[in-house]
Amino acid sequence: MSSENKNGKVPLISKIAYGFGDVGCNFSWMFVSNFLMIFYTDVFGISMAAVSALMLFSRFWDAINDPIVGGLTDKTKSKWGRYRPWLLVAAPITAILLVMTFWARPDWPQNGKIIYMVITYCLLVLGYTCVNIPYGTLCGAMTQDIDERAKINTSRSVAAMIAIGVLNIITVPLLSKFGSHSAKTGYLTVAVIYGCIFAACHFFCFAKTKEAVITPEKEKISVKIQLKAVMQNRPYLLALAGQILFGFTLYGRNADILYYFTYVEGNASYYTTYSMCIIIPSIIGAACFQPLFRKLNNKGRTASLFALFTGISMLSMFFFNAKESPAVFYALSGLTQFFFSGFNTAIYAIIPDCVEYGEWKTGLRNDGFQYAFISLGNKIGMAVGTALLAGLLGKYGYIANHTQNAIVLSIMKHAFTTIPGVLWIVTAVVLFFYRLNKKRYNEIVEELKNGRKS
């Protein structure tokens, strides 16, 4: 049962299927990150303060369930492997939870709304964790070849960028079409459509991928020992720091984006135009990861370079807007997305290599456990970014569906440009210190293979 040839090559269909997994993830999670906050405040009628509190509370929930799910995936035994069965079982459940999350009842009392919001969102996050952690870990289980892993992650990122582009272009028109009489009906209908896409993509990923890297049987290892091993894995710690910053910048900005176009630019339809302008640069940027990696032979340095230019181009966007300087604004948007897409490919390509380094350094291989903390780091960044945005907007007088005051508009503009721009540059500095290059990685893999043989 292997999708990996003896020379470590992975069939094209398996790479495509793996990419489809992230198509599904983005039709769920990017819909949530881009539209859930404005759905809560402007459609469901929940206060900014309650939304901000939820974003922070949910990360405590993640701190509990992410490592547990990661550990459980490592211990899973089935004829389909350790990680693939989770896609088959958890994907349809998560699709149902997505629909429940976007089931608005604005006529309920505020306390009832908040209780429903907390329960459905926390269950959705748990469901997504049960899909995304095994999905992310699966790449490392498909092959140990560093170049093949780069190709698999490029396939993942290209597919993800296409999915994000399509989602961003069609979502606002779909919400308008299905919500012409009621905004809550529009959101619910779109959630049903995207939930079906989410489940179908993961079924395809399950069917056409295989786990080829065989992990030796080992005795039960405590969480304490696994944490100690993780703390000795320097490349992994840098990747984790990068993921925290990545989550803060990506999801904080995504939560702001519809507010930005609706209130700062004054026209929510600009969001669709913006999305159309960034889809092609997204795909090209993802495809450019491999040639740049071949040049630098270091995935961390590759990610660092992409992050640096993402930050510079995002900072430049502060000086322009879609209403008065559309050509420059949309050109900079495309440039920003090009560099971001390259970074997105690189940062996820790093993670499987850190697993091999950790096994070489400590003698312990715990793919799912390590990916769980990567996922947690990303979600912590997301929590801080979205909660901070919601908290600031609420504090300075945001009123749903009304003209906003100057301070609120300023917060929305900076959250879209300068704040994430600076944080991208910080991310570039952090990942510059990633030392695990291609030559050293291949030496480590050979040592591990020889050690297992002996």
Model-derived segments and their meaning:
Residues 2-454:
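Membrane-embedded alpha-helical bundles of multi-pass transporters/translocases
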